[in-house]
């Protein structure tokens, strides 16, 4: 009498069914075509660093770059990429420690900040790589005008500056260094190889082989050029080594003839360049940039003071440098080029008593005597302490932004990379100084 109208499922059976059933998930469908609106302006917040970089670039005078563009209105030809885009891409990537042109080209397709800077303009790695090193003179001028603008606003003053050198690993290996005799053999071999490839190219093979042979020929010609440059520098390097009393034959790199083996910060010896930066202690703005292949900092003080005077129409009042810059001729040159300029550097013997009695410093010189007396005062020691807080901070930022090993070769190209870093550093300092609004003292 209590039988149900239809059979009911057992409670245990339904529980087992629920437990053993396949989970329901959303699977990716990568073949589905989608149309999505893209608002590049909405990709970045208002205070994003890319916007700061773009505002800085818009304030620069890029007319020398625009004058090199051959495509003009009313004539045939493909439109060129706006130099402001390339300038902003390199500055922003420098701040983000991205040093490879290929990596930056990929980021222009994948990263929102780079896509915002490009604004829909396609940029390839070859264009980026060429732009990095082709306009060193323009970058040098932009450094001067941008710092001069800060000086006009009262945010930067050349009253007190600090100079320091930082060793940057060159794009060359230690095994690439050869003596003069070996360089001559390498040049003869490269010349013969270029001739053989030229004959092979003139034989007119298939189109594919012709392109391959042409690429190989360009690579060998580039090596031939570098070896010839290295061989031409051998006599001058040997003369400098004899003057300095260095024994042994001179060796130069077949990969980068301008690189020199230097003692690095970790105590090792590797091919490198010596980057010289002069920075204001108030605001930490880079006002002078130079790149040399000298292994020491001696003799670098006067050229940098002269560069700053030439850039801004007046040199610094006080210069702070470490003991590696102490050179009698350099101190005299600074005093002669910029009267009234005081050099704050530790005298010989401050950290090494054995150096205090060398003949070079046992001279009856009023300049040396005044310098020693000044550095013995508590006031001078307090001023000198600002050197580490300025130069070492800038050097650390350089390392953090990828200025450890160069991806280019040659002094000129390496100096262009250093100028990119200086401009990127200064644009962030300018943004901070303008936000603070504190006048320089």
Locations of regions flagged by a protein language model:
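Anion-binding and metal-coordination hotspots
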Residues: 1-15, 33-35, 75, 97-110, ...
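Hydrophobic alpha-helical membrane-insertion signals
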Residues: 2-51
């Amino acid at each position: 009498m209590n039988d149900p109208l239809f059979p009911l499922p057992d409670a245990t059976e339904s529980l087992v069914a629920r437990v053993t059933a396949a989970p329901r998930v959303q699977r990716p469908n990568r073949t589905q075509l989608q149309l999505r609106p893209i608002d590049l302006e909405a990709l970045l917040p208002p205070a994003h660093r890319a916007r700061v970089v773009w505002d800085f670039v818009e304030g620069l005078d890029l007319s020398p770059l625009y004058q090199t563009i051959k495509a003009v209105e009313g004539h045939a030809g493909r439109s060129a990429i706006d130099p402001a885009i390339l300038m902003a891409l390199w500055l922003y990537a420098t701040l983000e420690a991205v040093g490879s042109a290929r990596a930056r080209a990929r980021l222009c397709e994948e990263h929102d900040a780079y896509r915002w800077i490009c604004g829909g303009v396609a940029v390839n790695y070859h264009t980026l790589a060429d732009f990095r090193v082709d306009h060193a003179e323009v970058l040098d001028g932009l450094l001067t005008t941008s710092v001069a603008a800060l000086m006009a606003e009262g945010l930067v003053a050349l009253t007190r500056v600090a100079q320091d050198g930082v060793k940057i690993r060159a794009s060359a290996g230690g095994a690439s260094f050869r003596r003069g005799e070996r360089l001559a053999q390498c040049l003869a071999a490269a010349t013969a190889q270029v001739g053989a490839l030229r004959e092979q190219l003139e034989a007119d093979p298939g189109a594919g082989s012709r392109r391959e042979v042409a690429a190989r020929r360009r690579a060998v010609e580039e090596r031939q050029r570098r070896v010839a440059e290295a061989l031409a520098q051998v006599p001058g390097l040997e003369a400098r080594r004899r003057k300095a009393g260095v024994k042994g034959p001179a060796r130069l790199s077949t990969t980068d003839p301008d690189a020199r083996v230097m003692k690095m910060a970790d105590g090792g010896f590797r091919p490198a360049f010596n980057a010289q930066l002069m920075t204001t202690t108030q605001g930490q703005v880079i006002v002078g940039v130079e790149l040399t292949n000298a292994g020491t900092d001696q003799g670098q003080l006067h050229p940098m003071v002269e560069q700053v005077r030439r850039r801004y129409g007046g040199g610094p009042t006080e210069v702070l440098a470490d003991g590696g810059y102490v050179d009698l001729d350099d101190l005299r040159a600074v005093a002669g080029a910029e009267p009234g300029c005081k050099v704050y550097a530790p005298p010989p013997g401050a950290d090494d008593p054995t150096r205090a009695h060398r003949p070079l410093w046992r001279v009856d010189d009023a300049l040396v005597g005044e310098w020693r007396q000044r550095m013995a005062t508590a006031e001078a020691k307090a001023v000198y302490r600002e050197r580490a807080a300025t130069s070492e901070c800038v050097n650390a930022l350089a390392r953090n932004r990828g200025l450890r090993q160069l991806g280019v070769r040659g002094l000129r190209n390496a100096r262009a990379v250093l100028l990119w870093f200086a401009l990127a550093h200064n644009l962030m300092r300018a943004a901070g100084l303008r936000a603070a609004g504190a006048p320089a003292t």
